[in-house]
A protein has these predicted regions:
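Extended, domain-scale alpha-helical bundle/helix-rich regions
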Residues: 78-115, 347
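Contiguous, non-catalytic segments that form substrate-binding/exosite surfaces or channel walls
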Residues: 119-127
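Active-site helix/loop of acyl-thioester processing domains in fatty-acid/polyketide metabolism
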Residues: 59, 66-83
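Extended, charged alpha-helical "arm"/coiled-coil substrate-binding scaffolds
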Residues: 2-67, 127-366
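Short coil/turn motifs at secondary-structure junctions
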Residues: 22, 116-118
Length: 366
């Protein structure tokens, strides 16, 4: 068996695997003899079916199985030994499929594999706005109006008095409308900050994907997406949505990998995961006052949560996104913009241009 590789440009590897009969013939015969020992057919005792009959019945399927095993092993070993950094997995090269496997002394298999590009990210080269959102007087008015509507008594809008103030902010000694407005503004701005932080991460991803340029083996990847979908995605779908759908997420994945490679601290550590779970589920508890037995029970619960595969994946994704969002905020060139919520929405959401109204016959008549 012999494996060779050539490059089709910088981003596509062509891998050729040559097999001769000696590479697989012994294993094929051994597998067929195992079938022979176990086979029971009418007119023959177990293990006495002629080998030629067994070969006629099972030879082709066993041959394909053993050849596929050898080719897969050779392909995987080649990727590992040569440290190929590939996207997805290799695909057979079109137009070079082997045939008539029974009657060839040597068989060649041809594969293609997309190589990951080298990406170096300098986050300081990328500028992004971050928003410090303050509640405007109009926004506070609208929120208070909503509070009054949501606390109607017998269809009567709730009055702005101490009863309502205490209902919304119990135990906080809110006695007058100005203090109430201040409290409302503080709560609004907490929500604004959380939303701005969520939006920052998504906007940062979009910006980096748009600004960090690198080539990909696009034609191969289009084919790979179709093959990997197992019939769920057509070539037409991929062609239509490739640039702004499929490849956008791939580009971010490659940029994220480059960031983690450049900054190993972004790799999740087990203790970070445990602390994250502890905060998520038990953050309201004062752990410093707990006895050892209670702490042990909490640790056992955390162990159970982390061992659950789906929960572990969800937690890892949340924590990785949180760490990366913080890293982007700290290392990109950030321009802080003071604004109100309406200004924030206009700045970060795509603005839809309304079509001009067509002049009607009635308009013309006027």
């Amino acid at each position: 068996m012999n494996t060779t590789q050539t490059l089709k440009g910088e981003l596509l590897a062509a891998i050729q695997i040559n097999l001769v009969k000696a590479d697989y013939e012994g294993e094929v015969n051994k597998a067929l003899k195992d079938y022979q020992h176990k086979a029971t057919l009418p007119g023959f005792r177990q293990g006495k079916v002629p080998f030629a009959m067994i070969k006629k019945m099972y030879g082709q399927s066993v041959l394909l199985e053993k050849i596929n095993q050898k080719v897969s092993e050779a392909l995987n070993n080649h990727i590992i030994e040569n440290k190929l950094n590939i996207i997805g997995y290799p695909l057979p090269e079109l137009g070079k499929e082997p045939n008539d496997l029974d009657n060839q002394e040597e068989i060649s298999f041809y594969f293609e594999a997309a190589l990951k590009p080298d990406i170096n990210v300098n986050l300081k080269d990328h500028q992004i706005d971050d928003f410090n959102i303050k509640a405007s007087e109009d926004e506070i008015d609208r929120t208070i109006k909503s509070i009054q509507d949501n606390n109607k008594v017998e269809e009567q809008v709730a009055e702005l008095n101490e009863e309502l103030f205490d209902k919304i902010f119990p135990g906080q000694e809110v006695k007058d409308i100005e203090t109430f407005r201040t409290k409302v503004a503080v709560e609004m701005e907490k929500q604004y900050k959380a939303e701005a932080e969520r939006m920052f991460y998504n906007r940062a991803i979009d910006k980096l994907v748009d600004e960090i340029k690198f080539d990909l083996a696009d034609e191969f990847l289009k084919r790979w997406i179709v093959e990997n979908s197992e019939g769920k995605i057509s070539a037409e779908d991929v062609e239509k949505n490739y640039e702004f759908g499929y490849v956008k997420s791939l580009r971010w994945q490659l940029i994220e990998e480059a960031l983690v490679k450049q900054n190993p601290d972004l790799v999740l550590k087990e203790e970070e995961i445990r602390d994250f779970v502890r905060s998520m589920y038990f953050g309201h508890m004062d752990l410093s006052t707990m006895d050892d037995e209670t702490k042990e029970r909490l640790d056992n619960i955390i162990d159970a949560i982390i061992k659950d595969e789906k929960q572990r994946e969800n937690i890892n994704n949340q924590l990785a996104d949180k760490k990366l969002a913080t890293y982007l905020r700290e290392n990109m060139t950030v321009n802080v913009v003071d604004t109100n919520y309406d200004g924030f929405v206009k700045a970060v959401l795509p603005q839809v241009e309304m079509p001009e109204a067509k002049e009607t016959d009635e308009d013309k008549a006027e």
